[in-house]
């Protein structure tokens, strides 16, 4: 694919849009870490490492100095990635998606290794050969005609690490916004506020284009603090202590509100597979690929590597120097699906568990429910009757967190009537909804939790059927007209959160009443619009999904054990 064109910034913009659900405000966290570094870091050691990184040749003691300082920085920061190796199996992703991911990781591995060891040059790292051996090898390559005399590496500089254990270099490079900002303020003699203002403008420019050295020079006239940023072209494996343009741009991306900047993505084990699935979808739409050409990573390669390095934390901006292994080591693709769990024996008087979830899926649901705060306002709504619900939504407006899932109905005739006059869900769109989700969610809800609802009868019956008489419901009792004041605005803002209400909904023809809305009723949208009626506005903040998308539906050929 070396002849294909990388539309770098267009890809970046597409990734920003596609992965916007996992971007979050990080400015406060970054500045808190910045202040911690300013007060606790020895900048004499920082200056020493910066001098070392400017040298063409480095040895074991230099690597030890870099690793020690990285460990000190990591201990002062709260934004750090933790070692969470991920194991992806059929079920969390389809077999085709797993094969695509595995292939891309292998291609990326080959590219990175070729980039670090460019043929015929000293490269960034050349195994555990000594400097003398490297020099002698270069002479031999010239003698047999493979390498031209006087040839050096890319950018005209040979960077050599003369170390025995190359694994100690892994994850010791790369910039962190908190470190970049603290170095600019402390070593540049600038106030923290001036640095933040300058980098914010650089970040705003980054929403429209990749800032280059000419842009940096122009912005430096307005913000003199930016003059400490190096005017050199980007290189492979430069230290996070070097004030490069790319490091400054990354810091700027974290200081602006909005923009869906990739740098602000945060993942954890419950959202990892969903993020990967979405990434592959964006890749397909934009025809992204892993290039075979050695050198800097393109936007898709970059985010793929960062996501797969660790399943928990901020892939772009956190301290990751304590992570062991690389992306292809820490994200393992397994093509053999786990055997289904044997059904639990039914005791006398007990109700059978229909469509039980596998332990790992049940654990993800439990973690999702634990993401709710028991003491906050919590809306709940269902579509379908309480004895045969087809959709459940639970929404907390203060945190914008929500649980949302579907269920295949048992009574198909009744379902089709409700679809025509109410929710607009088509049977084919919930045919493969994973059984057991609604029951599992209700089972793990905190004891005596209070819910807010528009109409309590159906919700109470649903809770009672699951033996949860301890759960309490507050009925707001809005009129039909009141409840839908914000309907159009809510659908306009958040329709991307729900794509299962595709059917045509027919207006009501009851005598003496106005025709009902022709918009389909969605449990999640209803929760958001009911809350908007009570507070008087629709929040701009993006709702945050607590259940991974990939567990909501199963593969069509999956057998359900009853």
UniProtKB/Swiss-Prot annotation:
<keyword id="KW-1090">Inhibition of host innate immune response by virus</keyword>
<dbReference type="InterPro" id="IPR012337">
    <property type="entry name" value="RNaseH-like_sf"/>
</dbReference>
<dbReference type="GO" id="GO:0003723">
    <property type="term" value="F:RNA binding"/>
</dbReference>
<feature type="binding site">
    <location>
        <position position="498"/>
    </location>
    <ligand>
        <name>Zn(2+)</name>
    </ligand>
</feature>
<keyword id="KW-0899">Viral immunoevasion</keyword>
<feature type="binding site">
    <location>
        <position position="381"/>
    </location>
    <ligand>
        <name>Mn(2+)</name>
    </ligand>
</feature>
<protein>
    <recommendedName>
        <fullName>Nucleoprotein</fullName>
        <ecNumber>3.1.13.-</ecNumber>
    </recommendedName>
</protein>
<keyword id="KW-0167">Capsid protein</keyword>
<feature type="binding site">
    <location>
        <position position="526"/>
    </location>
    <ligand>
        <name>Mn(2+)</name>
    </ligand>
</feature>
<comment type="function">
    <text>Encapsidates the genome, protecting it from nucleases. The encapsidated genomic RNA is termed the nucleocapsid (NC). Serves as template for viral transcription and replication. The increased presence of protein N in host cell does not seem to trigger the switch from transcription to replication as observed in other negative strain RNA viruses.</text>
</comment>
<comment type="subunit">
    <text>Homomultimerizes to form the nucleocapsid. Binds to viral genomic RNA. Interacts with glycoprotein G2. Interacts with protein Z; this interaction probably directs the encapsidated genome to budding sites. Interacts with protein L; this interaction does not interfere with Z-L interaction. Interacts with host IKBKE (via Protein kinase domain); the interaction inhibits IKBKE kinase activity.</text>
</comment>
<dbReference type="GO" id="GO:0039696">
    <property type="term" value="P:RNA-templated viral transcription"/>
</dbReference>
<feature type="binding site">
    <location>
        <position position="522"/>
    </location>
    <ligand>
        <name>Zn(2+)</name>
    </ligand>
</feature>
<keyword id="KW-1113">Inhibition of host RLR pathway by virus</keyword>
<dbReference type="Pfam" id="PF17290">
    <property type="entry name" value="Arena_ncap_C"/>
</dbReference>
<dbReference type="GO" id="GO:0039724">
    <property type="term" value="P:symbiont-mediated suppression of host cytoplasmic pattern recognition receptor signaling pathway via inhibition of IKBKE activity"/>
</dbReference>
<keyword id="KW-1224">Inhibition of host IKBKE by virus</keyword>
<dbReference type="GO" id="GO:0046872">
    <property type="term" value="F:metal ion binding"/>
</dbReference>
<keyword id="KW-0479">Metal-binding</keyword>
<feature type="binding site">
    <location>
        <position position="383"/>
    </location>
    <ligand>
        <name>Mn(2+)</name>
    </ligand>
</feature>
<dbReference type="GO" id="GO:0019013">
    <property type="term" value="C:viral nucleocapsid"/>
</dbReference>
<dbReference type="GO" id="GO:1990904">
    <property type="term" value="C:ribonucleoprotein complex"/>
</dbReference>
<dbReference type="InterPro" id="IPR038115">
    <property type="entry name" value="Nucleocapsid_C_sf"/>
</dbReference>
<keyword id="KW-0945">Host-virus interaction</keyword>
<keyword id="KW-0922">Interferon antiviral system evasion</keyword>
<keyword id="KW-0694">RNA-binding</keyword>
<dbReference type="GO" id="GO:0016787">
    <property type="term" value="F:hydrolase activity"/>
</dbReference>
<dbReference type="InterPro" id="IPR035084">
    <property type="entry name" value="Nucleocapsid_C_arenaviridae"/>
</dbReference>
<dbReference type="GO" id="GO:0030430">
    <property type="term" value="C:host cell cytoplasm"/>
</dbReference>
<feature type="binding site">
    <location>
        <position position="391"/>
    </location>
    <ligand>
        <name>Zn(2+)</name>
    </ligand>
</feature>
<dbReference type="Pfam" id="PF00843">
    <property type="entry name" value="Arena_nucleocap"/>
</dbReference>
<dbReference type="GO" id="GO:0019029">
    <property type="term" value="C:helical viral capsid"/>
</dbReference>
<keyword id="KW-0464">Manganese</keyword>
<keyword id="KW-0946">Virion</keyword>
<keyword id="KW-0378">Hydrolase</keyword>
<dbReference type="InterPro" id="IPR000229">
    <property type="entry name" value="Nucleocapsid_arenaviridae"/>
</dbReference>
<feature type="binding site">
    <location>
        <position position="501"/>
    </location>
    <ligand>
        <name>Zn(2+)</name>
    </ligand>
</feature>
<comment type="similarity">
    <text>Belongs to the arenaviridae nucleocapsid protein family.</text>
</comment>
<keyword id="KW-1035">Host cytoplasm</keyword>
<dbReference type="InterPro" id="IPR035083">
    <property type="entry name" value="Nucleocapsid_N_arenaviridae"/>
</dbReference>
<feature type="site" description="Important for exonuclease activity">
    <location>
        <position position="458"/>
    </location>
</feature>
<feature type="region of interest" description="Binding site for the cap structure m7GTP">
    <location>
        <begin position="53"/>
        <end position="238"/>
    </location>
</feature>
């Amino acid at each position: 694919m070396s002849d294909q064109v990388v539309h770098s910034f267009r890809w970046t913009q597409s990734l920003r849009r596609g992965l916007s659900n996992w971007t979050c405000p990080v400015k406060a966290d970054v500045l808190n870490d910045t202040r911690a570094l300013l007060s606790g870091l020895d900048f004499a050691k920082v200056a020493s490492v910066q001098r070392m990184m400017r040298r063409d040749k480095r040895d074991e003691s230099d690597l030890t100095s870099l690793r020690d300082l990285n460990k000190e920085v990591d201990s002062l920061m709260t934004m750090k990635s933790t070692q969470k190796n991920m194991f992806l199996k059929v079920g969390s992703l389809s077999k085709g998606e797993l094969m695509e991911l595995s292939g891309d990781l292998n291609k990326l591995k080959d590219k990175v290794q070729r980039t670090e060891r460019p043929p015929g040059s000293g490269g960034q790292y050349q195994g555990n050969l000594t400097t003398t051996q490297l020099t002698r090898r270069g002479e031999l390559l010239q003698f047999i005609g493979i390498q031209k005399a006087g040839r050096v590496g890319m950018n005209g500089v040979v960077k050599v690490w003369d170390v025995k254990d190359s694994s100690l270099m892994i994850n010791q490079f790369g910039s962190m916004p908190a470190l970049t900002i603290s170095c600019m303020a402390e070593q540049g003699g600038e106030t923290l506020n001036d640095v933040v203002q300058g980098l914010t403008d650089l970040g705003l420019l980054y929403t429209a284009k990749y800032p280059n050295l000419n842009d940096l020079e122009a912005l430096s006239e307005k913000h003199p603090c930016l003059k400490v940023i190096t005017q050199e072209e980007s290189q492979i494996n430069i230290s996070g202590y070097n004030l490069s343009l790319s490091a400054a741009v990354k810091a700027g991306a974290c200081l602006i509100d909005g923009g869906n900047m990739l740098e602000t993505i945060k993942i954890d084990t419950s959202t990892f597979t969903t993020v990967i699935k979405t990434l592959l979808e964006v890749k397909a739409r934009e025809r992204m690929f892993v290039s075979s050409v050695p050198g800097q990573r393109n936007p898709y390669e970059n985010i793929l590597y960062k996501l797969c390095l660790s399943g928990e934390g901020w892939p772009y901006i956190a301290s990751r120097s304590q992570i062991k292994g690389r992306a292809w080591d820490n994200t393992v693709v397994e093509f053999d699906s786990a055997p289904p769990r044997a059904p639990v024996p039914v005791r006398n008087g007990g109700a059978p568990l229909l469509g039980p979830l596998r332990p790992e899926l049940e654990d993800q649901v439990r973690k999702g429910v634990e993401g709710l705060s028991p003491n906050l306002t919590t809306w709940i709504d269902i579509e379908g009757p309480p004895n045969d619900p087809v959709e459940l939504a639970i929404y907390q407006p203060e945190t914008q967190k929500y649980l949302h899932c579907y269920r295949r109905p048992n009574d198909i005739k009744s379902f089709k009537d409700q679809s025509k006059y109410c929710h607009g869900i088509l049977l084919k769109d919930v045919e493969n909804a994973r059984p057991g989700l609604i029951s599992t969610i209700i089972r793990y809800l905190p004891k005596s939790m209070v819910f807010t609802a528009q109409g309590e009868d159906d919700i109470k019956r649903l809770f009672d059927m699951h033996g949860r008489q301890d759960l309490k419901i507050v009925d707001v009792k809005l009129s039909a007209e009141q409840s839908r004041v914000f309907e159009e605005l809510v659908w306009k803002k958040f329709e991307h959160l729900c794509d299962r209400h595709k059917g045509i909904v027919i207006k009501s023809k009851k005598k003496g009443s106005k025709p009902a809305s022709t918009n389909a009723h969605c449990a999640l949208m209803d929760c958001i619009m009911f809350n908007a009626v009570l507070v008087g506005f629709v929040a701009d903040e993006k709702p945050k999904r607590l259940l991974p998308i990939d567990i909501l539906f199963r593969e069509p050929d999956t057998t359900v054990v009853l």
